[in-house]
Amino acid sequence: MAVININEVITHLLPGQTIAGLDLGKKTIGIAVSDRGLTFSNPRSVLQRKKLTVDARTLIQIFDRENVGVVIIGLPLNMNGSSGPRAQATRTFVNNMEAYTEIPFVFWDERLSTIAAERSLLEMDVSRAKRATRIDSAAAAFILQGALNRIQNLHYMEG
């Protein structure tokens, strides 16, 4: 597995493969998966974190089931663009995943993604209890949708 740049994503996908989005938290991992056309992000489950080996095995099962070729993972930068402890924890998680999968990862700036996801759930009138269980997968979908939009723009610009 390698960490790749957003402009390399298309070259790493086989026909029919999807892209996964992850929102890595201390206790949970929000998961989203694109459609096969790489246009829409769809929230999936929220994984309750246990330990790396268990989390990695569960993620790989999801990636296999969803035919994932690339993973976009939110990088929680500080508002000034600097890296803090959460960004370092995300980088460490991706480095540790190298032992479990060959699927490449892309870091994606996730600043304000959770706020945007919560606002979206509020607009859909989702109850507080349901918001708490859905916020991480909604944030993953928001992260993934931003990356998908960028991929579409790159593809459009290339002709």
Curated annotation (Swiss-Prot):
Top EC class of this enzyme: hydrolase
Per UniProt, the keywords (alphabetical) are:
Cytoplasm, Hydrolase, Nuclease, Ribosome biogenesis
| Enzyme Commission number, as recorded | 3.1.-.-
Q: Which InterPro entries match?
A: RNaseH-like_sf, YqgF, YqgF/RNaseH-like_dom, YqgF/RNaseH-like_dom_sf
Q: Look up keyword Hydrolase and say if it applies.
A: yes
Q: A Gene Ontology biological process annotation? A: rRNA 5'-end processing
Kindly list the GO CC terms recorded for this protein: cytosol
Location(s) in or outside the cell: Cytoplasm
Primary location group? cytoplasm
Domain of life, per UniProt, equals: Bacteria
- Ranges that cross the membrane: none
Q: Name one GO molecular function term.
A: nuclease activity
Entry keyword Hydrolase: yes
**Entry's family note:** Belongs to the YqgF nuclease family.
Question: What role is this protein assigned?
Answer: Could be a nuclease involved in processing of the 5'-end of pre-16S rRNA.
Question: What is the protein's given name?
Answer: Putative pre-16S rRNA nuclease
